[in-house]
Amino acid sequence: MPGQHPDPIRLPDLDGNLVELAAIAPGRPLLVNVWASWCGPCVEEMPELQRFAAAQGADGVQVVGLALDEAEAVRAFLRQVPVDYPILLDRPGPADASVRLGNTRGLLPYTVLLDRQRRVLRQKLGPFQPGEIADWAAAGTGPD
């Protein structure tokens, strides 16, 4: 999957608006983190993802959360652990967005780094450790 463009992914945000993943933050790399409110390791890494997202400038990596969860569960979770980056929703299953982004094992959390042209640069199965995200994402911040 690295170097390839994933199939188009269009999902609702928390307000029910359909959003094309590739259209978020044009010209910026995307770090797409797939998670769920019931996933312990996902919950543990959310503050680190928020810190990373907040440290990005106008041209930095755009973080996008992709929750394989029910909207109300996600809203309740985000009241406890707020984030400033966009959150999209999908239902878990054999053709969910995580699978379409290359998560063949179906485990969470799962993160994909897309370059400015929305090609897959890197994939990570499992949680980030503190301080790991910036180095991992650095592959997407250079010139294309």
Question: Which residues are covered by each model-predicted region?
Answer:
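Hydrophobic beta-strand anchors of alpha/beta hydrolase catalytic cores
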Residues: 31-32, 63
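Conserved hydrophobic/aromatic "anchor" residues
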Residues: 9, 34-35, 77, 85
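C-type cytochrome heme c attachment motif
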Residues: 37-44, 110
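A short beta-strand-turn-helix
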Residues: 8-30, 98
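N-terminal targeting signals for export/organelle localization
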Residues: 1-12, 122, 138, 142-144
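Aromatic-flanked redox-active Cys/Sec active sites in thiol-based oxidoreductases
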Residues: 33-38, 68
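Structural microenvironment flanking redox-active thiols in thiol-disulfide oxidoreductases
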Residues: 43-82, 92-98
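Thiol/disulfide oxidoreductase modules built on the thioredoxin-like
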Residues: 79-84, 90-138
